Amino acid sequence: MQILPKVNTLRKGSLLYRGIRYRKGFGVHSPFVFNLITKVIEEKCSYYSFYDIELLRKQLLFREGEITYPDRQNKGKRKTRSIGEIVKRESIRPKHGALLFRLTNYFKSKNILQIGTTMGLSTLYLTSYATGLRCIALENLPEFA
């Protein structure tokens, strides 16, 4: 009975060691995955458009007005929240938005389909790396569109 918990502990420890060892991409055999990890995921430099998008986020956070939309948990009920609260709760975080920007910049996407934009900040991150992109953003709730 005592051997099983030790085996699980050793297994978790080895998985943790592998995660730490290969975190920066070293030890990954695939050149594609190595470049993706080192040049996209682990890159820390700030790009030119991040400042503009975060300035727009701050403007939306302090914007007056409320939006009434259907509640996800309680079917049939409606919620009323301020625009700032919706941006704070539902929009993409700056860290994840920067990752979206770096991914689209790395793959040089020309056509982008986004489902569920919620105020459009993630759409800005996806499309701000170049001009002349074709982006189709679908939003289920007309209040957020």
Residue ranges and their predicted role:
Residues M1-A145:
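A short alpha-helical cap/connector motif
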